Amino acid sequence: MNIILLGPPGAGKGTQAQRLVERHGMKQLSTGDMLRAAVKAETPVGLKAKAVMEAGQLVSDEIVSALIGDELDAMPAGQGAIFDGYPRTAPQAESLDAILESRGRKLDHVIELDVNEDALVERITGRYTCATCGKGYHDKFEKPAVEGTCDKCGGHEFKRRPDDNEETVRTRMAEYRAKTAPILPIYESRGIVSRVDGMADMDDVTAAIEAILAAR
């Protein structure tokens, strides 16, 4: 089974992808992670990508496609893949079809985590973590039992990510919509797109995704 998982930053894609990995033994293919790993390992594709990046240029679709092909070739035949961050354009969608078909695979599901922009802004801008142990909290939804003290380690210092601000979140939402708009109709025409309420409880989101996978 091969899945594309869509959703803006903060929608919970990472959590749901990890649960799919744990439950179904699938492999998460994140283009960013694959690129960094290939460059570090100095594979032929990695060296090509490194040269492009050092020249200050964007990594081409051809290089990304080669990375994905290499990853799929290294996977057992029966292992499913979760595509994260790819495809983002119509040409990339066509390329992915060709990559999968040449390896006897096909795309089974495109699952989009649907979110309310205002609610997502509230979710992201309110989150913070303990500077000592990393336990997560939220201004509204998950406060420490004792204000100013971490429930887990008793620490008193907390931190927020610098990009967890409203302007950045809304910019990322706009970028996400612009990037996914061209590819969704391609997959909708095949009847493989499903939408899940990404604002629901994480366990409910997982249950909804599992129901989609079980239905086909």
Curated annotation (Swiss-Prot):
E.C. number: 2.7.4.3
Pfam families given in the database record: ADK, ADK_lid
Residues at which ATP binds: G10, A11, G12, K13, G14, T15, R127, A200
Gene3D superfamilies found in the cross-reference section: P-loop containing nucleotide triphosphate hydrolases
UniProt keyword terms in alphabetical order: ATP-binding, Cytoplasm, Kinase, Metal-binding, Nucleotide biosynthesis, Nucleotide-binding, Transferase, Zinc
Residues annotated to bind AMP: T31, R36, Q57, L58, V59, G85, Y86, P87, R88, Q92, R161, R172
Residues involved in Zn(2+) binding: C130, C133, C150, C153
Top-level taxon of origin: Bacteria
Region of interest (NMP), residue spans: 30-59
Disulfide links within the chain: none
Compartments (UniProt record): Cytoplasm
Main location: cytoplasm
Domain notes: Consists of three domains, a large central CORE domain and two small peripheral domains, NMPbind and LID, which undergo movements during catalysis. The LID domain closes over the site of phosphoryl transfer upon ATP binding. Assembling and dissambling the active center during each catalytic cycle provides an effective means to prevent ATP hydrolysis. Some bacteria have evolved a zinc-coordinating structure that stabilizes the LID domain.
Protein name as catalogued: Adenylate kinase
Organism: Novosphingobium aromaticivorans (strain ATCC 700278 / DSM 12444 / CCUG 56034 / CIP 105152 / NBRC 16084 / F199)
